[in-house]
Amino acid sequence: PVVLALGHSGSWDRAGAWVCAHGRAIVTVAEKVEPPSLFERFVALREGLGMEIIGVAKGESVFGSLVERVRGRSVIVPLLADRDISGSGIEVDLGRARALVAAGPAALATKLDRPLFVACITYENETPTGADVRVRCVGPVSVPKDLAPGANRVEALTQAWVSEFAAMMADKPQDWHMMQRVFVEDLDPERLARARAEHERKNR
């Protein structure tokens, strides 16, 4: 599999549709939004485009299922990861502030011993009636060569892809439509602590 870290920018559905139309398989994870009927419509749309979707609820982990679904297959695994919903997020430098992002892409690449790429999707040639979608992809990203012995590789790899994404996103920040709180200073520390405790309880 090709593991790809994405942020909530541009139209990843259009990008995914293009990939599927050109004969490549996609397996990805989608958050279970409310009401369930809305989530079902999102899944139907993406499956209709040729993608395989694994649903995940807040506080839930589908990492094991994802590993088994993609291991040994020739698939692209794009994962939206600039926001953590699992309660096991990694704190990174995003621009000039600390943010909490998902461990998924780095953890999957490490687990499968596969390279990690990062993509930034933006709009180009915008008109009142539409726009083109531009996908920029870099990688494989790597951990620093001077990574200390015993340091957490997943954390280092996560910081590496976030830094690449932030650099690309700086050209079109208006296309980053993150409508949730991701910066640590904006998060409720008590709620975050509860989410982490619940994640640990479920994954003992």
Where in the sequence are the language-model features?
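Catalytic core of membrane glycerolipid acyltransferases/transacylases, capturing the structured
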Residues: 1-58, 87-92
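Non-catalytic C-terminal accessory region of glycerolipid acyltransferases
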Residues: 21-25, 48-49, 60-204
